Every structure is written in C-alpha cells, then in structure tokens.
C-alpha cells in the first residue's frame, strides 16, 4: 500500500501525456537530452590536459638572470 506499483506510474504517465501532449513532452525530452550531452562534453574538455604549445607566452621572467643582476649590483657598491 505504501509503495507505488507499475500501474500507478502508468496512470500518472497517461495523465501527464493528456495534460501536456506528446509533442511538448518530446520537446522537453530533447532539451533535457541535449543539456546532459552538453554537460558531459564540457566535463570532457575540462579533463583534457592543455598542450604546452597552445599556451600563450606572456612576459616570462628568468629568475636566475634577475638574481645575477642583484648580486653584481651589490658588488659595485
């Protein structure tokens, strides 16, 4: 009595189909499926490692050269 049997779910499905119509339900199903597919594709893109060649080079600083300059400046003083 507490659980819902298959007959209860079939009756609920029939009522929903009558209220909304099968075309509207099909559109909702397509929208939901494409949203799930887009989410999965987005998760796959996030997991893929970025190629080092594709990363932009932006103002990298050579730390060793900077330290060498500081030590030569302190020797002059």
UniProtKB/Swiss-Prot annotation:
Membrane-related topology note: Single-pass membrane protein
Protein name per Swiss-Prot or TrEMBL: Sec-independent protein translocase protein TatA
Residue span of region Disordered: 40-77
Keywords from the named record: Cell inner membrane, Cell membrane, Membrane, Protein transport, Translocation, Transmembrane, Transmembrane helix, Transport
HAMAP family: TatA_E
Protein purpose: Part of the twin-arginine translocation (Tat) system that transports large folded proteins containing a characteristic twin-arginine motif in their signal peptide across membranes. TatA could form the protein-conducting channel of the Tat system.
Location of the protein in the cell: Cell inner membrane
Taxonomic lineage from the root: Bacteria, Pseudomonadati, Pseudomonadota, Betaproteobacteria, Burkholderiales
Transmembrane segments: 1-21
Family from the record: Belongs to the TatA/E family.
GO cellular component, one term: TAT protein transport complex
């Amino acid at each position: 009595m507490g659980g819902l049997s298959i007959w209860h779910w079939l009756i609920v499905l029939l009522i929903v189909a009558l209220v909304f119509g099968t075309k509207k339900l099909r559109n909702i199903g397509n929208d939901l499926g494409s949203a799930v597919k887009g989410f999965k594709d987005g998760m796959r893109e996030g997991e893929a490692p970025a190629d080092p060649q594709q990363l932009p080079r932006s103002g990298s600083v050579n730390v060793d050269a900077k330290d060498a300059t500081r030590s030569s400046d302190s020797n002059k003083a």
